[in-house]
């Protein structure tokens, strides 16, 4: 279980880094940096603004690209702006650029998910250390009780054995009761992964809608968090299912509908017990040979020639040897058999 959470942590760190790149794109980085969602008409587009590559002028970070009355156009007077502000690669209006804020929402959900799983791993690590120390203490108590047992008398030995068994049972019960319940954390992680997948998918669709002819590598990289988050969701569901099944089978209480536990116990018993399906019926055979005492004869083939040559009026030959009706001898020797020969009538 601990290794599974570490694998999830590594996968989430990769997704978190990929989702961080669009958030820190231009205008937070310089225009010379290779972190942008699209490059079109000497302009680099990010989530919170745009930058002019030639003049090294960037807009102020804001949700949505600068409108027609923005001061950005006063510093960068370009005829390509027209009357509607900045021209996007897909020729859509600049107001649709506000959809890019979904990148930030997806990044926030991934950050929360990363914090939860990192905290869960730390808690499990400390719980493992504490449980290990408790088990070592129990083993030390057992060894000390064994030393005192050898030095006492027989009556005292019995009392000490009972006390040690009672203490061991109490210690094991307390350790079992302090087992950490992962279900609330798993439910919280499932909620975060679900919303992270939805928001990352919506952000990728917004990138395609705005920059579809000139979408950069950073936009296509957003497919990796989508697939990874879907994989993380499946793994979390599998872990939750395995934990709930283990708790159900290891529970000491009986339930009203306990068919699942009974079926599992029956299957395990039949799997480990070789005599589980034994009904007392034995079949002895020598393959395709006929044994008469110590003489072994191969059977004759019932061909048409042999049937014509060995023609009889009866179709069934009387058995040579019958099994004894005595119960004490029934099935005692594999040499006792009934030999029958099938003859076809002419």
Swiss-Prot record:
GO cellular component: cell division site; growing cell tip; plasma membrane
Membrane topology value: Multi-pass membrane protein
Cytoplasmic side: 1-3, 127-190, 240-346
Parts forming coiled coils: none
Subcellular location: Membrane
UniProt KW Lipid metabolism keyword: no
Keywords from the UniProt entry: Membrane, Transmembrane, Transmembrane helix
Principal location class: membrane
Transmembrane feature ranges: 4-24, 106-126, 191-211, 219-239
Stored Pfam families: SUR7 (PF06687)
Protein role: Required for the proteolytic cleavage of the transcription factor RIM101 in response to alkaline ambient pH.
Protein family according to the UniProt entry: Belongs to the palI/RIM9 family.
Protein name: pH-response regulator protein palI/RIM9
Origin species: Candida albicans (strain SC5314 / ATCC MYA-2876) (Yeast)
């Amino acid at each position: 279980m601990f290794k599974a959470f570490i694998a999830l942590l590594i996968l989430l760190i990769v997704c978190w880094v990929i989702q961080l790149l669009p958030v820190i794109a231009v205008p937070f980085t310089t225009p010379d940096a290779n972190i942008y969602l699209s490059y079109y008409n000497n302009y680099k587009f990010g989530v919170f603004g745009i930058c002019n590559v030639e003049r090294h002028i960037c807009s102020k970070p804001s949700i949505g690209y600068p409108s027609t009355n923005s001061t950005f156009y006063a510093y960068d007077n370009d005829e390509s702006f027209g009357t509607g502000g900045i021209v996007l690669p897909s020729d859509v209006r600049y107001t649709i650029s506000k959809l890019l804020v979904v990148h930030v929402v997806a990044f926030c959900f991934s950050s929360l998910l990363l914090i939860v799983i990192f905290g869960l791993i730390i808690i499990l690590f400390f719980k493992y250390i504490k449980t290990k120390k408790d088990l070592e203490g129990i083993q030390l108590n057992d060894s000390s009780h064994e030393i005192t047992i050898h030095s006492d008398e027989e009556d005292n030995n019995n009392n000490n054995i009972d006390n040690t068994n009672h203490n061991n049972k109490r210690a094991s019960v307390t350790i079992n009761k302090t087992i950490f319940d992962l279900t609330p954390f798993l439910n919280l992680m499932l909620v975060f992964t679900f919303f992270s997948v939805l928001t990352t998918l919506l952000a990728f669709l917004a990138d395609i809608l705005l920059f579809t002819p000139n979408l950069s590598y950073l936009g296509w990289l957003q497919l990796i968090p989508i697939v990874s988050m879907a994989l993380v969701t499946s793994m979390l569901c599998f872990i939750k299912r395995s934990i709930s099944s283990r708790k159900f089978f290891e529970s000491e209480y009986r339930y009203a509908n306990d068919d699942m536990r009974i079926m599992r116990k029956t299957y395990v018993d039949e799997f480990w017990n070789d005599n589980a399906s034994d009904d007392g019926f034995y079949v002895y055979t020598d393959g395709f040979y006929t044994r008469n005492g110590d003489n072994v004869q191969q059977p004759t083939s019932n061909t048409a020639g042999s049937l014509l040559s060995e023609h009889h009026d009866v179709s069934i030959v009387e058995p040579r040897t019958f099994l004894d009706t005595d119960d004490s001898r029934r099935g005692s020797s594999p040499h006792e058999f009934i030999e029958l020969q099938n003859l076809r009538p002419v």
